[in-house]
Amino acid sequence: MPVKKKPLKEDGFVFETTGGSVTDIDTSDMAGRSVSFDAHFITGKIMDFGKVLTGIPLYSYQEEIAYRIIYSVITFEGSVLTVLLSRQSGKSETMAFVIDTLTVLLPALAKIIPDLEQFSNGFRVGLFAPQSDQVVTTYSRAMTRLTSANAEMVLSDPDLLVSLESEVRLNLSNGSFLAGQVASKQSKIESKTYDLIIIEEAQDTDDFLVTKSIEPMLSATGGTLVKVGTTGITKNHFW
């Protein structure tokens, strides 16, 4: 069932977008797979699109995180990226920005950039966390941003024409989706394939589960694994 559209303001976007310029981000240490397009230029444009789509005002450190993830995805680095931030510093908001931006835009870019053909039928994101409420936090934020008036305006653009196909799940008409799963020791989570995986509260996620079940889900796609968390009390795959 299509999601009911919200009324739009006549004078443009509902949320004012703020933040610094992506040209201020240090990209000297980024080197992905050889692609035929200017990866940094495209990453910058994707970031600009995401700000309009979501209306999320990112701080400079959040922009650097989002930029690094997006660059890794479109260059098929196959990287494992670690995001270590304190509590209440905007981890979930940053991940929601990345999820919404890539699920909406990458299938459209795949039609005009041959290197991104892998995403022509949708961009697949897996979201994992040790407890269900931790999954819900990021999942719900991503859904909220995609049902905003800002997003409705962007999604209805003739060059995109993307819509949510559910009121409770992030499944888009372009084939993209966000799947949220609990990553506890008792979980059975094999047999899925993703282009991007995000592990929330990575410091509390079981080492064996990450190695045996989660990491192989990216092997066929050259996808990016993002481990997000804060400091823990034991040393594991996160630290």
Predicted regions and their residues:
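Phosphate/NTP-binding elements of NTP-utilizing enzymes
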Residues: 2-239
